[in-house]
């Protein structure tokens, strides 16, 4: 099966004038938001090639593996983008990163400038930090998270900052707005959708919103009059992340390798020379996983959902678990702290906690083991 990495390597000499920018190229843009461009990409434009080269020079292979626990092939993608005709003229700018354990924020975004001047605003999904996963849990009961507000404001600021262009021999000026797309994978897809939906007066400036296996929204978010005609969510056939919470956008199902949460990795998705390989329907495993997650958490009343999500966060804090990888490698001291915390809970809460930890560990194990090889 050809995947995204193969696609980039095999199409490296074919520029966009020969084979136009497509959904697979958009996924490349979405994945680039996971890269920590801090100190490399700032307000001014820098070429994608140069940014990739600088980034790879900062870290050893071992360091890159530890940074991208859930995106183990991302360093290979960055390497493949260093010297290509297809992506050589793409520029990066306006990288923004906000991280706070205290406020539970894990947010980053970067703007890509395509050769034709189009802008792609790419929002990052969840990294391997527990803070990022706490943020995901908050999405199940909160309608306006700090990361979502940051995404909305970033779009508003980007449109406001479009420079004026002179015409009539310089006597007059006006803004010429380029085509603009919003994209992101996982939570990043949710942020792209949120930023579009919460900027109704700016939707005319946005050509399309491409979410890649992005979750939906908490109960009560949708008001019924939103325009979702420009939003598409691409989800793998075993999808769980891209199906949870409330969705109204159109969905396209992709063929993919692996099973369960493994398919959340975009490098597991099947592509051909100019598009994804699509499926007619989702799998039974996807339906079963969704039913399990809904029974475990999503179908609970709002207040109960919020309380249970707080319990998970408190358990991880007490056990000093800071990354998802820590779940498979915690010490006896951490386990003891967890037991002490759990002993304070009632029987139903204890059962819930074990089910959540088991689900995360079982679904994450194939990814984490692969990343350590």
Regions found by a protein language model. Name each.
Residues 43-44:
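Charged, often low-complexity linker/regulatory segments
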Residues 92:
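Active-site-adjacent helix-turn-beta-strand microarchitecture at beta-sheet edges
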Residues 192-200:
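Short glycine-enriched nucleophile-adjacent loop
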């Amino acid at each position: 099966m050809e995947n995204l990495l193969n696609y980039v390597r095999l199409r490296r000499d074919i520029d966009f004038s020969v084979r136009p920018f497509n959904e697979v190229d958009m996924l490349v843009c979405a994945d680039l938001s996971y890269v920590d461009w801090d100190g490399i990409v700032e307000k001014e434009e820098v070429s994608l090639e140069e940014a990739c080269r600088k980034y790879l020079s900062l870290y050893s292979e071992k360091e890159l593996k530890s940074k991208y626990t859930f995106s183990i092939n991302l360093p290979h993608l960055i390497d493949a983008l260093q010297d290509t005709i297809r992506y050589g003229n793409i520029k990066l700018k306006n990288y923004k990163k906000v991280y706070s354990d205290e406020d539970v924020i894990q947010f980053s975004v970067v703007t890509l400038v395509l050769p034709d001047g189009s802008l792609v605003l790419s929002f990052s999904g969840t990294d391997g930090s527990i803070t990022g996963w706490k943020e995901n849990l908050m999405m199940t009961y909160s309608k306006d998270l700090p990361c979502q507000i940051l995404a909305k404001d970033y779009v508003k600021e980007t449109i406001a900052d479009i420079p004026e262009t002179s015409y009539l021999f310089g006597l007059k000026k006006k803004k010429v707005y380029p085509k603009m797309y919003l994209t992101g994978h996982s939570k990043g897809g949710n942020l792209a959708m949120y930023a579009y939906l919460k900027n109704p007066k700016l939707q005319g400036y946005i050509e399309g919103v491409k979410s890649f296996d992005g979750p939906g929204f908490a109960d009560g978010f949708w008001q019924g009059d939103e325009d979702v005609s420009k939003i598409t969510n691409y989800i793998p056939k075993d999808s769980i992340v891209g199906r949870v919470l409330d969705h109204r956008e159109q969905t396209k199902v992709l063929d993919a390798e692996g099973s369960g949460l493994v398919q959340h990795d975009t490098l597991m998705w099947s592509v051909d020379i100019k598009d994804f390989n699509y499926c007619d329907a989702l799998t039974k495993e996807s339906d079963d996983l969704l039913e399990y997650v809904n029974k475990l958490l999503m179908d609970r009343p709002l207040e109960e959902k919020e309380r249970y999500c707080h319990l998970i966060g408190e358990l991880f804090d007490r056990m000093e678990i800071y990354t998802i990888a820590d779940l498979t490698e915690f010490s006896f001291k951490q386990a003891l702290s967890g037991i002490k915390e759990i002993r304070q809970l009632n029987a139903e809460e204890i059962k819930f906690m074990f089910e959540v930890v088991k689900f995360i560990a079982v679904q994450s194990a194939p990814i984490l083991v692969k990343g350590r090889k």
